Amino acid sequence: MADSKKSIYQQAGEWGVPFGLYLSCAAVTSIFADWFMPLQFLFLILLLGTPLVVYYFQRRRFIQDDGFTEYAGLWMLGIMLFLLGTLICSLIVFLVLQYVRPTYIVDQTQAAVDFYKTLPQMKDSEMLEAVQFAIDRKILPTPIEMVTSMFWFVTFTGSLLSALTALIAQRPLPGKRRERKQ
């Protein structure tokens, strides 16, 4: 009988879809949190839960391999999860920013400028003038530019997070001893 064990990449491909939907939920709750305040709390829970979700997938793979998955394999699984998950999330966030909330970027930037103008030390700030200039001239980043930046940021930070969770996911299985390679 042929070995039907999936490669790290196949596994990440399967698990990346639900992970992408998870990341999408977090991003969309963040986008709509200014309209419905309880979403801020939900966003915080989803954000803090991200390492646990990555750990869950890495640990699941480690257990499937009877504790013999190397650190590099678990880390690669995490990287690929973030790569695929962020790709799915980016598509959804782009659609939301482009078609559902097209003024989101301008609204949030203007809200930040208005808030900082209330602070005495920021009243005559050149930074605020520059940002207000960008708002007035309509030269703020477009949804695709924001999503592209988000994609690279989340993928990079996710790879670092995966390095950490892979270390934890490798803890020995109960009742099993790992043989050291000589």
Report the location of each language-model feature.
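Functional transmembrane-helix hotspots
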Residues: L91-P120
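Individual transmembrane alpha-helix segments
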Residues: F133-F156
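Membrane-helix interface/capping segments
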Residues: Q58-G73
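Alpha-helical transmembrane segments of multipass membrane proteins
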Residues: P18, Y22-A26, S30, T50, ...
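Transmembrane alpha-helical insertion/packing segments
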Residues: M1-F62
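Low-complexity, acidic polar-rich segments
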Residues: P120-K138
